[in-house]
Amino acid sequence: YAARIYDARRIPEMLNVAIQKAMSGKPGPVYLDLPGDTLYQMVDEDAIDWSQSGRAILNARPPAPEEQIAELVAALAKAERPVLLTGSGIIWSQAWEEMHALVDATGIPFYTTPQGRGVVPEDHPCCFPAARSTAFRDADLIAVVGTRLNYIVAHLAPPRFSADATIARIDIDVEEIAGSPRKLDIGIVADAKVALGQLNKAIAGKIDPAQYDHWRSALAEKEASKRAGPGSNSLSDAVPIHP
């Protein structure tokens, strides 16, 4: 969101709009331009509408349609090599508990963008950071939650990501779903926290983590191989640090 203020009397109003845009829905940067002639305007304080000031941030949490949640559950149950890829939307939505519960309940390997790290500890048995390329390339289902499909995730494009994988995506911004750079098999417009909560309820008893044992084992083997290779000391926990 970007706007220019020409009338100093509208500063409180437009500042409120900018704050709402920055903090609600899908948070992001905003820009307000105040030209010099606006800054030096002399206005009567009584002519300023202060009613827009101090309004609470609108924090809507749209749920996912139940039929789409059911479709995602069915796709996960059918998948043999699923991957969960999440971003900062998990943090903004405060959905870390729901994500942790989903990973624990299903045993699906997960990866985060740099902006979304830490929502689930990286020493979790379903986290294989050094095997990231293998996971993305070999996955038969990729569930993306709360992240743009930009250069950070290579736009989810082959060959870095499997060309044949089923793509499911949850995002609070309808434009992210409608304008996805990769065709979505399941595109859900919903708040991450609410949608993952719905998914956790719907998935109960329908997925056995053991069905992905072979997938996790393959990634664990690749992880161990990467850690043992050249440069493996960069992953060492040894104390003191080798100079």
Outline where the language-model segments fall.
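Generic secondary-structure signature for well-ordered alpha-helical cores
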Residues: Y1-D7, N16, Q20-G28, D44, ...
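Glycine-rich, acidic loop regions that bind phosphate or pyrophosphate groups
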Residues: Y1-M14, T113-A218
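Short, flexible loop segments at the rims of nucleotide/cofactor-binding pockets, characterized by
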Residues: A8, L58-A64, S88, V119-C127, ...
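Active-site glycine- and acidic-residue-rich loops that bind
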Residues: P12-E13, S88-Q94, A238-P240
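Conformationally flexible catalytic loops at phosphate/diphosphate-handling active centers
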Residues: V17, K21-K78, A224-A228
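Glycine-rich beta-alpha junction loops
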Residues: L34-Y40, S88-I90, V174
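Anionic-ligand anchoring segments at beta-strand to alpha-helix junctions in alpha/beta enzyme folds, i.e.
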Residues: A64-P65, E71, L76-I142
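Active-site diphosphate/adenylate-binding microenvironment
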Residues: A218-P243
